């Protein structure tokens, strides 16, 4: 599949964005990927490539583009402490604007997914941008917390108006089992269409094949086909086999 890295300008700052393209002239459905704490790396690019192979334009914006080299060279988890939800929303929306300005994209068929911290961001974007027709968060924690001023993703759940598919590892502590129950209960109370899938023996980041300590192939091999089926149903109108 063809791919490239483009540069977008967001709030006066230059942001890299990886894009993977399916074959054919389109117009194609598209998916915006919110990356994990590792940043825009081989894992995220591979996920975009897989989506392109399934017929989607996939883009991954570099949400760390405001960070100094010192921050990026430090502990990975420390990067999250510098993130602000307002900046994340601006960056993700810049990726959406890139898509909607392209005639090869069907603006009525755009979804969002994310891994790790990107799972949280996928929820956040579903609650703040109605263009998304479906959302697939992978093991997104910290849903009940805000990054910078403003409401938490959890408190904005009423604003979500698209179906959601969640993937969790049964051994993951973030989100905790209690947090998952709370998320499920709130989405149910609000009448939001959602599916929760928990994978036995999997911990956090079980999709990340670049991390042997985290990767759980048995779970990943179930979660990814479910994801493609979900996108096909909601972005292509395809009938998903029972």
Residue map of PLM features:
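Active-site loop/turn elements of alpha/beta-hydrolase fold enzymes
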Residues: 56, 63, 140, 199-201
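A short beta-to-alpha transition loop/helix N-cap that caps and shapes the active-site region
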Residues: 67-71, 142-147, 174
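Short beta-strand/loop motif that positions the catalytic acidic residue
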Residues: 160, 166-168
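Hydrophobic residues in well-ordered beta-strands that form the structural core
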Residues: 59-61, 137, 166, 196
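C-terminal catalytic histidine-bearing segment of alpha/beta-hydrolase fold enzymes
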Residues: 188-242
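Conserved alpha/beta-hydrolase "acid-adjacent" motif
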Residues: 173-182
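Serine-hydrolase catalytic machinery in alpha/beta-hydrolase-like enzymes
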Residues: 5-105, 152-153, 206-211
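Primarily recognizes the serine-hydrolase "nucleophile elbow" in alpha/beta-hydrolase
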Residues: 94-159
């Amino acid at each position: 599949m063809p791919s490239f890295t483009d540069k977008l300008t967001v709030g006066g700052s230059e942001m890299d964005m990886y894009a993977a393209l399916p074959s054919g002239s389109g117009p194609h459905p598209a998916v915006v990927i919110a990356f994990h704490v590792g940043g825009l790396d081989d894992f995220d690019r591979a996920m975009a490539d897989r989506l392109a192979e399934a017929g989607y334009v996939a883009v991954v914006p570099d949400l760390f583009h405001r960070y100094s080299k010192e921050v990026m060279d430090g502990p990975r988890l420390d990067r999250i402490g510098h993130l602000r939800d307002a900046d994340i929303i601006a960056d993700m929306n810049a990726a959406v604007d890139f898509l909607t300005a392209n005639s090869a994209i069907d603006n009525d068929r755009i979804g969002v997914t994310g891994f790790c911290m990107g799972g949280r961001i996928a929820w956040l974007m579903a609650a703040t941008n109605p263009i998304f027709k479906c959302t697939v968060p992978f093991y997104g924690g910290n849903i009940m917390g805000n990054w910078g001023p403003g409401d938490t993703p959890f408190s904005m759940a009423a604003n979500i108006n698209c179906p959601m598919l969640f993937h969790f590892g049964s051994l993951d502590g973030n989100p905790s089992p209690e947090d998952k129950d709370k998320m499920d209960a709130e989405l149910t109370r609000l009448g939001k269409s959602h599916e929760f899938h928990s994978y036995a023996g999997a911990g956090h980041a079980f999709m990340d094949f670049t991390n042997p300590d985290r990767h759980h192939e048995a779970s990943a091999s179930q979660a990814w086909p479910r994801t493609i089926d979900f996108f096909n149903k909601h972005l292509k109108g395809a009938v998903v086999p029972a």
